[in-house]
């Protein structure tokens, strides 16, 4: 009886959370990413060096549907280390770029942010996408260049740590924020990142 009460309490708590999330996604309008364009198609057709798994293709299709809905997307992507979450994140960012928006990826540690930057930069340079790295140890001159590139739109994809939350970090047209290990960030921090857009 005690186990059943605990189970029911947890079940109804989860149901309440799900209801709130559904309500928020209906209330909060998002950008409409109506097309998959040159960046996505060029990388997929000419530069992808391994076949995507069925699960990766399915998730990318689901994300594309969410991004085209006009509602704010709040999606959790789970997988083991090395399961291909980074390539899914990269394709998702390319959809944002193909629709004229910028994207950012926030990681909880400088080591993880640097790993993402190195992996994604290698892929991005093949299709002419400009990627930046912003962490707590980024030098002042580099920060200024990053800030200028974000505001004029020449820096299309920014990867970093909590440094992305600084007030000085503003975008010309931020359309997508990807948060790695989102459980390591507070709700207020995630919301602050979502609000970063000068338009």
Q: Which residues fall in each region the model found?
A:
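Conserved pre-motif I regulatory segment
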Residues: 28-78
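Conserved glycine(s) of the Walker
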Residues: 84
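Loop/turn-to-beta-strand initiation segments
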Residues: 100-104, 130, 153-157, 173-176, ...
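Conserved helix-turn-beta segment of the N-terminal RecA-like "Helicase ATP-binding" lobe
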Residues: 112-151
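Upstream accessory/linker segments immediately N-terminal to the RecA-like ATPase cores of bacterial MutS
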Residues: 1-47
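Conserved SF1/SF2 helicase motif Ia
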Residues: 74, 88-117, 125-130
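Conserved motor-coupling elements within RecA-like helicase/translocase cores
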Residues: 137-158, 165-174
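SF2 helicase catalytic motif II
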Residues: 149, 163-199
């Amino acid at each position: 009886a005690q186990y059943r009460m605990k189970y029911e309490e947890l079940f109804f708590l989860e149901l309440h959370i799900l209801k709130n999330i559904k309500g928020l996604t209906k209330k909060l309008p998002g950008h409409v990413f109506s097309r998959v364009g040159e960046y996505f198609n060029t990388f997929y057709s000419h530069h992808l060096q391994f076949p995507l798994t069925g699960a990766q293709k399915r998730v990318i299709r689901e994300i594309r549907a969410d991004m085209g809905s006009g509602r704010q997307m709040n999606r959790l992507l789970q997988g083991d280390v090395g399961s291909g979450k980074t390539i899914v994140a990269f394709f998702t960012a390319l959809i944002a770029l193909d629709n004229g928006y910028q994207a950012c990826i926030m990681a909880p540690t400088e080591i993880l942010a640097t790993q993402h930057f190195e992996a994604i930069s290698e892929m991005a340079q093949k299709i002419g996408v400009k990627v930046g790295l912003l962490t707590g140890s980024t030098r002042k001159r580099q920060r200024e260049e990053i800030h200028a590139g974000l505001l004029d739109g020449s820096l299309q994809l920014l990867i970093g740590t909590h440094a992305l939350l600084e007030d000085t970090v503003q975008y010309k047209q931020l359309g997508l924020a990807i948060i790695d290990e989102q459980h390591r960030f507070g709700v207020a921090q995630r919301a602050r990142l979502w609000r970063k857009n000068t338009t």
